[in-house]
Design a protein with these regions (language model features):
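Signal peptide processing junction and immediate N-terminal pro/mature segment
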Residues: 28-36
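Bacterial N-terminal signal peptides that target proteins for export
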Residues: 2-18
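Short pre-active-site segment immediately N-terminal to the catalytic Zn-binding motif
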Residues: 489-508
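Short His/Asp/Glu-rich catalytic/ion-coordination signatures at enzyme active sites or charged loops
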Residues: 52-67, 116-135, 158-200, 259-299, ...
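C-terminal, non-catalytic "cap/extension" segments appended to globular domains
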Residues: 40-64, 74, 255-257, 386-388, ...
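Bacterial N-terminal signal peptides
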Residues: 15-28
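N-terminal helix-rich structural modules
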Residues: 36-242, 668
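Active-site-proximal, well-structured secondary-structure segments within enzyme catalytic domains
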Residues: 171, 175, 207, 214, ...
Length: 719
């Protein structure tokens, strides 16, 4: 199917969507490859034909590591052959012999890649890691070979140009317009000479993105805080001290080491009593990639911004953000920037109130100094403890994993959408802890398969995410096979798995993604389920989070695992109220990073190479976000999301999706809350539609108007 051709490997992590772009501009990545070519691909390979298991799910019990590479390589070859046949079809281009044919293409590759994508992240081993390194650049080259296929694009353009007279239904018309846009965005409309220019820009961009990552990793390692004086770490728990000692041993150092997280603020600053230590750690974080040494990233990122602007100009856009947002819900950088700008006044006003409260606390303790960013976390933690503190050991007995799943996650899905769940212990899994459920619609009709892989393992990537083994498509006759992965602590044998409320929220969040995939009801796989823009894809998952703290749902699952008694009201109230604590600060740092991202990516190609420090300061001042005690969540010099991880001109998407989900939950509250009528309407008008129509129009039609920022501000406690 066409969405595979412009390929991206998606990994959803704790509420965010991290997208590793393997397609456009990575053809130059086909360098040295140490992995041996795959062996012969034949009927003995489990991916040779469609699975005979229910829902065509993957036969994990029959797959050897080597089967993945053989099937992926055969799938690539088959896909290129299929595309070549479409591009060179002697018949005149039609919707059926071009677009429908493309949607049918690549099924072998999809079967193999989707399964490999799962195990390489959730249950990897050295052989799978070698295959990953080998296949990533080959997948990129495959995408380029299709994106820039001149004959194929000529057929696509011919149909696009006459689309209004073809009598296409709405979904088919959407497919034509969307995929034409994707090919144009990839450079298919360029002359051969300009395609070569684009390739060179892409190659340099890819190289510099890797350079940025390499420099930043080295900078973070060089600026970790190391000490042999235990007194400087006063305030850390024994567990934290033990972890710091282990970190020192790993680096063959004496004493203790506190490694840098990639955010500006560091977790340990909330506990360290010594102000000089806090200051030193903050400075290490703030200046980590600005030392004027080999690890300094400023020249690299400035050139990256310039390259992206030049690429956008070549493709006919005024700036990179304008190019990148053409297929997003926001559509234009002006819309994204206007949205962020509107959130700044209320957010910074709340941060100012919080700062005054913290300064009062500092003064009451005889501090004798003015609040600085390295003080915020320490004193905010004292306020949090006083107002909202609860011991995790008090809370966890009320959040037993199976109970949360069945009486919380499944209960909410049943009340809203009529779903029921039956565990399928007869189906193979990729690891013994994985569970499989068949999901049924209200009338008992099979809807999907859903896997959950919840426990931490050494060979599993961190975080939490959702993805699919099989996507829904009426054209292909497939129903969804979806999975959620997390990293909860595994209990000792015979003991219950007890969760924090953050873990509970993660379960609801990832299941929201799963519902989006399971409810898909579309003809074409390229438009199905979660195949939607970044600033929309987190909306269904974040919306589903709300049910974790909904009073009716919470009371149903928050019960002691031994006695069945409900959580005491006072403790439950603390959990709910703590959600809005310190949100002026937290949201200000997010807005600052989001605005910085867009400021870098609205630069025109004619702009001179910018000095990152000057540019950053001036940008924050223009946005009224140059606040001494609230630094950006990421400084430009270590903003990994936008210089390496594919979030350039897209970091705003987290907050945009939050606006959508808060408006949606407000609508539910205004219309009776947790009811089947509300759930069914939301499912049929939003969750089932995938990318089959303009998402803004679709959302507005369901909501009954355009979303506003007011519910978002309310949910964060900012008004």
């Amino acid at each position: 199917m066409l969405q595979t051709f412009i390929h991206s490997a998606k990994r959803r992590v704790s509420g965010s969507t991290i997208v590793f772009l393997l397609g456009i501009g990575a053809a130059g990545a086909c360098g040295a490859q140490t992995q041996k070519a795959a062996g012969t691909f034949g009927p003995s390979n489990p991916f040779y034909g469609p699975s005979t298991l229910p829902f065509q799910t993957t036969p994990f019990n029959k797959i050897k590591d080597s089967d993945y590479q053989a099937a992926i390589d055969a799938g690539m070859a088959q896909q290129l052959k299929e595309v070549d046949a479409i591009a060179n079809n002697p018949a005149a281009p039609t919707f059926k012999n071009t677009f429908v044919a493309l949607e049918r293409a690549g099924q072998l590759y999809d079967r193999a890649w989707n399964a490999f994508n799962l195990v390489s992240q959730a249950n990897t081993d050295p052989e799978l890691e070698k295959i990953q390194d080998y296949e990533a650049p080959r997948t990129a080259a495959l995408a380029d070979a299709i994106n820039l296929n001149t004959k194929l694009f000529a057929r696509i353009k011919a149909i696009y140009d006459q689309r209004a007279s073809l009598g296409l239904d709405a979904e088919s018309l959407r497919l034509v317009e969307y995929q034409y846009q994707q090919f144009v965005k990839a450079g298919a409309n360029l002359s051969d000479a300009d395609k070569e220019k684009l390739k060179k820009l892409d190659e340099e961009e890819s190289t510099l993105e890797n350079t940025f990552m390499t420099k930043l990793l080295a900078a973070a390692a060089a600026d970790q805080y190391s000490t042999t004086d235990r007194t400087t770490l006063a305030g850390l728990s024994e567990g934290q001290m033990d972890a710091a000692a282990e970190e020192a041993k790993a680096h063959k150092l004496q004493g203790w080491v506190l490694p840098l997280q990639n955010t500006t603020q560091q977790p340990d600053l909330a506990f360290l009593k010594d102000r000089a230590t806090r200051h030193a750690i903050f400075e290490n974080s703030w200046k980590r990639a600005e030392r004027g040494d080999a690890n300094d990233t400023r020249a690299t990122l400035a050139r990256l911004a310039q390259l992206r602007a030049q690429k956008a100009a070549l493709l006919g856009y005024p700036n990179y953000a304008a190019w990148n947002l053409t297929d997003q819900m926001a559509k234009t950088p002006e819309a994204a920037i206007g949205f962020l700008d509107a959130l700044v006044p209320a957010t910074t006003a709340k941060a100012a109130v919080e700062a005054k409260d913290i300064q009062v606390l500092i003064d009451s303790q005889g501090g004798g100094f003015t609040l600085e960013p390295w003080d915020w976390e320490f004193y905010a933690e004292q306020v949090r403890k006083e107002k909202y503190d609860y011991d995790e050991s008090q809370v966890k007995p009320y959040f037993e994993l199976n109970n949360v799943l069945e009486k919380g996650v499944f209960y909410a899905a049943h009340e809203l959408y009529g779903l029921t769940f039956k565990e399928r212990k007869d189906l193979p899994v990729w690891q013994a802890d994985v569970r499989v459920f068949e999901v049924y619609d209200a009338g008992g009709k099979p809807l999907a398969l859903w896997y959950c892989d919840y426990f931490k393992r050494d060979n599993k990537n961190g975080g939490a995410w959702e993805d699919s083994l099989v996507g829904q498509s009426k054209l292909l006759g497939t129903l969804p096979v979806v999975y959620n992965v997390a990293n909860f602590e595994k209990p000792a044998p015979g003991q219950p798995a007890l969760l924090s409320f953050d873990d509970v929220t993660t379960m609801f969040h990832e299941f929201g993604h799963a519902l989006h995939a399971m409810f898909a009801d579309t003809e074409y796989p390229s438009l199905s389920g979660t195949a939607v823009p970044r600033d929309f894809v987190e909306f269904p998952s974040q919306f589903n989070e709300h049910w974790a703290s909904n009073p009716t749902v919470f009371a149903h699952y928050a019960r002691h695992y031994k006695t069945g008694e409900p959580m005491p009201a006072e403790l439950a109230a603390k959990i709910v109220k703590a959600k809005t604590f310190d949100q002026g600060y937290a949201f200000t740092e997010i807005l600052a990073a989001s605005e910085l991202d867009l400021e870098w990516h609205v630069l025109p190609a004619t702009a001179p190479l910018e000095n990152p420090d000057t540019f950053e300061q001036e940008a924050l001042e223009r946005k009224h976000l140059a606040i001494s005690y609230v630094p950006p969540r990421y400084r430009s010099s270590y903003f990994l999301h936008i210089w390496n991880e594919g979030y350039q001109a897209g970091y705003y998407a987290y907050t945009w999706s939050e606006m959508l989900d808060d408006n949606a939950y407000q609508w539910f509250e205004d219309h009776g809350g947790l009811t089947r009528a509300n759930g069914d309407g939301f499912r049929h008008m939003v969750l089932s539609r995938g990318n089959t129509e303009d998402l803004q129009k679709m959302y507005d039609a369901w909501l009954g108007g355009e979303p506003t920022i007011e519910p978002l501000l309310k949910n964060r406690g900012l008004k």
